[in-house]
Amino acid sequence: MKNCAWKESGNLCIIGKEYKEEKTMDILKNENIKNAAAVLWHKFLLAETVNDIILSEIKDRLYLQNVDEDWLMSPETSPRDTFMARITDLAFGDVVEEAVTSLYENKEALLPYSDLTETKDPGRLYDLMMETVMEQLICQDGSTVKKNPYYEQIHISPDKENCIALATADYLPYEFFQTFPRYKKENPFLYGEAGFFKERMTFPVILENNRVWMSVVPSEIRSMEKDIEVAKGKVITYGLGLGYYAFMASEKEEAESVTIVEMNCDVISLFKRNILPQFPNKEKIRIIEADAFAFIEKQEDGIYDTAFSDFWSDVDDGLDLYLRFMAKTARFAKTKHSYWIETCFMEYFFRPVLIRVLMEQITEKKIIMPEVSGRIRKVQNRFKTYLKTKNDRITSPEELTLLFTNESMISLMRDFAVKNPMRP
């Protein structure tokens, strides 16, 4: 996870002096374009600050203790005194206040994020950040999870195979957890989203050396909705986990069969022994013990109708795997491929590069962003170089905005992955 953008450290962002760089895109630099770019830039700064606040707090396992539910559920007195506003204030009020204070007191050190202070006084900036945080929070309905077909059908009993264990974990009441982000047209840079339940919720997990490796939680469920929706015919999935995708795909009448490619024999053993027997349509399931990269090399186009890749655990460990595997699947025309949390890779690592490149070209100033790991920085630098090969012409604010849509960004990412293959 990135360093908090609003905290002073040696890794913070500055805007350098003017510099000359090879043009990336042909941008018409009229006032309308410049104004639209400035609006996008401030949306980015606000979003990155809010993303870091939410995700940093969740990483520390944020939860509200001794909650006064009578007060929380009491009649709302104004738009600023709602249930969600009270939750937001309890959970994030102090850290947002700290962030705003830091932005005003350490402007030089916190550039470019302190640009947010140019047009707003501290009170208004605090309100704006709190409103944005609140929009990123979701009170989850536990009944919707419990009514999920997988939860209704699959019951987990503790079991172990070498260092891999099948178990359950839980969320405490009012414990915040990261959820799968919803695209927001009004601010495409927002991806830090958190949910909570009012009740204790239990969910299945796979542990590796006593640490959670895989789980079926609300974020996982929502992250696969579109991929499950398009599953039909002969389906193949690379990565088994707890079998959520395989289960949901096998439940569809449109799915003739579901082939699972998994290289971990212990995960396969636990699944076959504990989970697969509970599948209503277990006869549709076929498991192949193999490495996904080795398997895809020999796979013929059209043997399967739908393919889904999910053999990484999160955005950090998955970035290289996604880019490498996506490039391997680009040759398929008949088999339709999708990739777990592809939009998250876009939001975390690629969309920020595009806005940075755009602003550097328009302002002719170098923008230095917070340090990330060397591996991620290498990918981002290669993506920045790749953008220089694009001949897009931007002549209106509308065209500028379209660059940052999910469709446009995913197209860029996939083209980048194919033209700049990653090494193992």
Describe each model-derived feature in a short phrase:
Residues N11-K17, E21:
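Short, positively charged and aromatic/hydrophobic N-terminal segments
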Residues D26-G195:
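N-terminal auxiliary segments of SAM/dcSAM-dependent transferases
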Residues V217-E229, K234-L276, A290:
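SAM cofactor-binding core of SAM-dependent methyltransferases
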Residues M248-A249, K298-E300, L321-K328:
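A short acidic, amphipathic alpha-helical/loop segment
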Residues L270-G302:
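S-adenosyl-L-methionine
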Residues G302-F311:
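Short SAM/SAH-binding signature in class I
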Residues S313-F416:
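C-terminal substrate-binding/active-site "lid" region of AdoMet-derived donor-dependent transferases
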